[in-house]
Amino acid sequence: MRTGRISRKTKETDIQLELNLDGKGVADISTGLGFFDHMLASFSRHSEFDLKVRAEGDLYVDEHHLVEDVGIVLGRALAEVLGDMSGIARFGEARIPMDEALAEVALDVGGRNYLVLKAEFASPQVGQFSTQLVRHFFETLASNAKITMHASVYGDNDHHKIEALFKAFAYAMKRAVKIEGKEVKSTKGTL
């Protein structure tokens, strides 16, 4: 089974995360940020990765440190579980609608980190979650997971746009980490 556990404790946050890429989409999430919990649970459900997150942080300051550090830990867990990336499909993409919103995500799980995100939000926050943190979360995750991610979303409702992005990311990841053999998908023979 492709599973991992990662912890991170700083003066700002304390995070424990468990990940199973070959799970059933079971989520057990507690970050103290309801909307963020909902997005992580949605990612778990639609990727079919089992995901357990226990995160505490200095929310009295704001949610930035907590969201950033969850991105770090989830990215590191993905990198650890995938190892040298032997046998995985490597590439994944998805187009996911949510009512008036449409999100597209294309991934290369190939050891090089980069994010291109085309997204505009009308509201500064959804619940207690700053819409500025959507980009920061995915940048941090991509950097630590060593994945390249191109994503775009349009729509009218910021909740729908963000949720469609998380779901599209989930389906793209599910496809990219699918086992398709034993070889590394690279002409170099390594990633």
From Swiss-Prot:
GO terms for molecular function: imidazoleglycerol-phosphate dehydratase activity. GO terms for cellular component: cytoplasm. Keywords: Amino-acid biosynthesis, Cytoplasm, Histidine biosynthesis, Lyase. Pfam families: IGPD. GO terms for biological process: L-histidine biosynthetic process. It catalyses: D-erythro-1-(imidazol-4-yl)glycerol 3-phosphate = 3-(imidazol-4-yl)-2-oxopropyl phosphate + H2O. CDD domains: IGPD. Pathway: Amino-acid biosynthesis; L-histidine biosynthesis; L-histidine from 5-phospho-alpha-D-ribose 1-diphosphate: step 6/9. HAMAP family: HisB. Belongs to the imidazoleglycerol-phosphate dehydratase family. This is Imidazoleglycerol-phosphate dehydratase. It comes from Methanosarcina acetivorans (strain ATCC 35395 / DSM 2834 / JCM 12185 / C2A).
